[in-house]
Amino acid sequence: LVEGFQYGSLGFKQIDGGGKTGFDKRDYLAKFRVNTNPEAKTYQSLTFKIGKATETSHETYLGLTEDDFQHDPYRRYAGSQKDLMETEQSQLSATHFINLSRSFHITTTVYRSDFSRNWYKVDNVTDSAGVKTSIGKVLEDPASYQEAYSILTGASSSNLNALAVRANNRSYYAEGIQSVLDFNFITNDISHDINIGLRYHKDEIDRFQWDDLYAMNNGVMSLTTAGV
């Protein structure tokens, strides 16, 4: 069995000055099974599964001020032009099934899953006086942070490191093995099904993120300081 699913969109918002706002997602899965004759005294099967999924989304955390939203809810500020979400996932598993009798069967699965993602998105603005302000505060009260608001909307910045774009980088994995014994029987016309399982599991997350700094020049962001 092989399956594939792809979908995407060009997006429905418009960035000041132009830019991508859509997404592309791809998901693939393959399964393969070998087994003994179904009529065999001890039936066994071995199933392999492999999967791969990716996503590229030109999505942002940056919203709009109340007034700008009322005027055009589909607008995106120029300060979000670099925002990008990228993800990748892979999974592997092998499952062994053995039917010992009408009442007993054992299912054992070995598995591994890996997932990584990086949401690269504007985080804060630093004005010409060196005052750093989060994007949330700017949008809540643009009148108090007029210079920061102007930079977000595309006005040229005198500060070369005006916009901080954070790489929210993560990677995860999970792996393990589990066995389940299924025991079923009937007593006095009552059917019983008992499962006894044992699992060894391990998972981990690795988080490494950094900030790249940009200047805004007439609606175009230019990298000035690369994060490490």
Can you say where each PLM-predicted feature lies in the sequence?
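A short local loop/turn or secondary-structure capping micro-motif enriched for an aromatic residue
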Residues: 9-11, 55, 115-117
